[in-house]
Amino acid sequence: GYQFEFVDSKMDFGKYRLLILPDLIPVDKKLKEKLDRFMNGGGKIFLSHEAGLIKEKEGIREFALPRWGISYKGEAPYEPDFIVPKGEAGKGLPCVEHVMYVRGSEVEATDRGKVCCMVKRPVFNRTYEHFSSHMHAPSSGEEVYPGIVEGENSFYFAHPIFTIYHLYRPGWCRKLFCNIMNMLLPNPVVKHNGPSSLEVELLEQKEEKRLILHLLHYIPQHRSEYVDTVEEIIPLYHVEVWIKTEKKPEGAIFVPEGEPVDIRLEDGYVHIKVAKVEGHRMIALSYR
């Protein structure tokens, strides 16, 4: 998991290691200069679909920063089409066609970009002219344009991956995104071995010289029209958490119980084992 905050174009980017521009974030002159300064300072960027395009001027659309290694050609001619996961970006996924349910962008990789995964077109678009009783036509097997491009400290995804995940929840979109996050941020602040339903939050109390780790595992169910409810608390067992910190830990306790927590240092991480998480557990990690 990754700690994250929502930001806008007027906020200070300097304290972040990575910015994510999802699907439809246009860039004006001021934001372009700000993103350039951010990357000059070592910052990294993930963007998808039409995010990062300069606001349209005289019918010309182009990406704000050449260092991203992509050239915009227009709206993709096929919907849906298919992406073929390969290499580190496709780690854990079979190297076969995975359907991308929403129309993406057609791009080319420039000499500053490296194509990680290609898109394959369908046999035809499902319209009144070429009808299929299924949701879409199958893949033709023909590669047509890049699906994922690695640039300078950046990755670009040609499809609106966040919109697709919001509408359809395909597991491969989440896996591709997580793989790319691991490539951009190989040493996250927090790692854990729990399921995706486990929420992990890490806070710092500087005056008290301690970190506060929250582990929450409540699964809401959509059983009514207006409200999601938690019917039962489902416990998790043998949860392990790794916290990256340059501070020297003195000890840890469960809060409010006050019981000691065993900690171990491993390659710059504090390793914590929690036997059981029943809804919520809080751990205070003191440092010097």
Q: At which residue positions do the language-model features occur?
A:
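Catalytic grooves of carbohydrate-active enzymes
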Residues: E5-S9, F155, I161-Y165
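Short, flexible/disordered intra-domain loops and linkers
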Residues: K55-R61, H166-G171, E225-E232
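Helical hinge/lid and interdomain linker segments adjacent to catalytic or ligand-binding clefts
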Residues: G1-F63, R126-Y128, S132-S140, V255, ...
